[in-house]
């Protein structure tokens, strides 16, 4: 099974149409990867589906980088 990081990166690549090497932990979805508000909503929905969890809107707004998404998923899967 792939790591959480790998699964998150794969989703980001698929959702935003960016190259895998562009998807680093520090990469901002909006500033570095060119996501708009619709992209970020779709990204959160894809993460929810992949990891079978619910990310409340107020939490989703705080997830602005790849690493923040990974950390959020880890915290909620393990917690």
UniProtKB/Swiss-Prot annotation:
One of its GO terms (cellular component) is membrane. Transmembrane segments: none annotated. GO terms for molecular function: acyl binding; acyl carrier activity. The modification O-(pantetheine 4'-phosphoryl)serine is found at residue 37. Coiled coil: none annotated. It is found in: Cytoplasm. The keyword Signal does not apply. The keyword Manganese does not apply. This is Acyl carrier protein. It comes from Halorhodospira halophila (strain DSM 244 / SL1) (Ectothiorhodospira halophila (strain DSM 244 / SL1)). The lineage of its organism: Bacteria, Pseudomonadati, Pseudomonadota, Gammaproteobacteria, Chromatiales.
